Amino acid sequence: SIFDKLWERHVITGQEGQPQLMYVDQHYIHEVTSPQAFQGLRDAGRKVRRPDLTFGTFDHNVPTVNIYDIRDVISKAQIDKLSENVKDFGIEHAAHGSELQGIVHMVGPETGKTQPGKFIVCGDSHTATHGAFGAIAFGIGTSEVEHVFATQTIWQVKPKKMLVKFTGVPPKGVYSKDFILALIARYGVAAGVGHVVEYAGDAIEHLTMEERMTICNMSIEFGSKMGIMNPDQKTYDYVQGRPGAPKDFEAAVADWKTLVSDPDAVYDKVIEIDVSQLAPMVTWGTNPSMGVEFGAAFPEIRDMNDERAYNYMDLSPGKKAEDIDLGYIFIGSCTNARLSDLQLAAKFVAGKHIAPNLTAIVVPGSRPVKRVAEKMGLDKIFMDAGFEWRDPGCSMCLGMNPDKVPDGVHCASTSNRNFEDRQGFGAKTHLCSPAMAAAAAIAGRFVDIRQLPEVQ
């Protein structure tokens, strides 16, 4: 498989089945999981071994209204510390407020540093996003961040391999976010544990790079640290011309073309999903597997987890997504804040206005995305419809910055996690596609977007 080929290229020492020392081609860092790692280097009198293979950005704590108005003491300390650390250790970075700044899993691909064949790590669980390019990419802990800083290597046990084949043509109103939410709803949040998940099939091949990133992004919610896809012409076209793209691009592509799974590749587990049978997805509970197709009733209580989820969400079995009274809409996050996500959402709000008593925010995932979106007039479409148009950052995906959902309020969110208190204390999160979130903003509740003229 592609994973085997990449793994073999990066092993320095060690036996399969045991921890093996792996070479890291690209290390992304942000302000939350790096301070202690940098301090460890200082205490040991070490340098960052390959600052040229390290890239930093500011995202988790960044306010999206006034990015410099950081009132939380810990948030400010983390941002100030990363500014100091990247300077002291000579690390390239998208400075706070700079023209490149944004969510780490968007900035990496946008700069062209994420490429097929690379072994990529970052102190963030959604690092699997970069696997959409045909790279091994996964999240690591702070002590591992320090190890990579010091050695440009990491100890890792080779995981088992799972193949998830998405086949067929999706119905109108069904998007890549629905593919991954449907997979997780069917098989659970632990199905991928101990495996790298390779996503393949004609339905994946027909997706754009941005749509593919959405699927790989949520591998961790499926239980897998790593998601990967075979690179193809769309991948090469995306990377070409970006600042970090290989200088001898033709030679790089010739190599990348060898980095695909062979027809006879063997997997430990295979799952097939016919996307023509899928529907728009909405989560009802407190983990991403607690989701249903729009129109389906929420399930009966099967265990204590379900009971707790229903109590927290103030919902009950038999209810449907359209019964939820929404108070907030969040379009953003490293899952769905790319240009195509914003274009899709804008289609559903153009010339309309959000429902009364509703707060709706759009947070582009990076400064470049925001810039292009504004050139296209997307900001005006959203603001005319009553949305707030924000600066880039992780924003309302997690309660680490000023963007929080109030206690007890239901939020339609294009992010990746619906845990208790994830978007703020007592916040009730419903994961969905940008199209579902945008349409819900207008109606004040979830609607069947398949019936709307925007999808025809």
Curated annotation (Swiss-Prot):
Pfam families linked: Aconitase (PF00330)
Q: What is its EC number?
A: 4.2.1.33
Any idea which GO molecular function terms this record carries? Answer: 3-isopropylmalate dehydratase activity; 4 iron, 4 sulfur cluster binding; metal ion binding
Q: Give one GO biological process term.
A: L-leucine biosynthetic process
Reaction equation(s) it catalyzes:
(2R,3S)-3-isopropylmalate = (2S)-2-isopropylmalate
User: Which residues bind [4Fe-4S] cluster per the record?
Assistant: 334, 394, 397
Q: Which cofactor does it need?
A: [4Fe-4S] cluster
Q: Which Gene3D superfamilies match?
A: Aconitase, domain 3
PROSITE patterns for the chain? ACONITASE_1, ACONITASE_2
What keywords appear on the UniProt entry? 4Fe-4S, Amino-acid biosynthesis, Branched-chain amino acid biosynthesis, Iron, Iron-sulfur, Leucine biosynthesis, Lyase, Metal-binding
Q: What class of enzyme is it?
A: lyase
Supply the InterPro entries for this chain: 3-IsopropMal_deHydase_lsu (IPR004430), Acnase/IPM_dHydase_lsu_aba_1/3 (IPR015931), Acoase/IPM_deHydtase_lsu_aba (IPR001030), Aconitase_4Fe-4S_BS (IPR018136), Aconitase_4Fe-4S_dom (IPR036008), IPM_dehydratase_rel_enz (IPR050067), IPMI_cat (IPR033941)
* Biochemical pathway: Amino-acid biosynthesis; L-leucine biosynthesis; L-leucine from 3-methyl-2-oxobutanoate: step 2/4
Query: What does the protein in this record do?
Result: Catalyzes the isomerization between 2-isopropylmalate and 3-isopropylmalate, via the formation of 2-isopropylmaleate.
Q: State the oligomer form and interacting partners.
A: Heterodimer of LeuC and LeuD.
What family does the entry list? Belongs to the aconitase/IPM isomerase family. LeuC type 1 subfamily.
The protein, known as:
3-isopropylmalate dehydratase large subunit
Q: Which organism is it from?
A: Streptococcus gordonii
